[in-house]
C-alpha cells in the first residue's frame, strides 16, 4: 500500500480530495484516564479548585475536535456537522472513559477529529486535577468505529 501523504519524490503533501464523493462520515473514538481515589472523588463530588472538571473536559473535547487540522499537519480543515462527547464514570479503576463522536458530510473522514477530541478531553481532566494526583494514566485512546467513505466501515 502506498502512503498517500507522500508525493512521487517522497515529499510530504496534503492529499487532494477534490475528486472524492461527498458522503456522510461518522467516527467514534474513546480513551480512559485512571487516577487515585482522592482525585476521582474530588471530580464526582465537584470539589476541585478549578471548577467542574467533566463539563470542562466535554467542552475541551469539542474544541479539540474543531482544531484538529491546526494540530496535525496533513489533516484537512473540515466543516464538522456534529460533535458529541460522553464521559462514563469507572469507579472500579477509579477513573473515567471519555468518548467523542464526530460527524460530517464531506470528502474526507473524521477519525482524526474524534481521536484529537478524545485526547484533549482526557488531557483537560489531567490538567484540572494534577494538583491532587500527578500519577494519573491516560491510556487506550483508540478509534472505536467509523462509517462512510471509500475505505469502508470499521468497528473495533
UniProtKB/Swiss-Prot annotation:
Which keywords, in A-to-Z order, does the entry hold? Lyase, Molybdenum cofactor biosynthesis
Q: Where does substrate bind?
A: 74-76, 112-113
Q: Where is the active site?
A: 127
Q: Which reaction does it catalyse?
A: (8S)-3',8-cyclo-7,8-dihydroguanosine 5'-triphosphate = cyclic pyranopterin phosphate + diphosphate
The family annotation for this protein states:
Belongs to the MoaC family.
UniProt function note: Catalyzes the conversion of (8S)-3',8-cyclo-7,8-dihydroguanosine 5'-triphosphate to cyclic pyranopterin monophosphate (cPMP).
Q: Which GO terms describe its molecular function?
A: cyclic pyranopterin monophosphate synthase activity
Q: Tell me if Lipid biosynthesis is a UniProt keyword of this record.
A: no
Question: Pfam family example for this protein?
Answer: MoaC
Q: What is its EC number?
A: 4.6.1.17
Question: Its pathway?
Answer: Cofactor biosynthesis; molybdopterin biosynthesis
Q: What is this protein called?
A: Cyclic pyranopterin monophosphate synthase
Q: Which SUPFAM superfamilies match?
A: Molybdenum cofactor biosynthesis protein C, MoaC (SSF55040)
Species of the source: Sulfurimonas denitrificans (strain ATCC 33889 / DSM 1251) (Thiomicrospira denitrificans (strain ATCC 33889 / DSM 1251))
State the Gene Ontology BP annotations. Answer: Mo-molybdopterin cofactor biosynthetic process
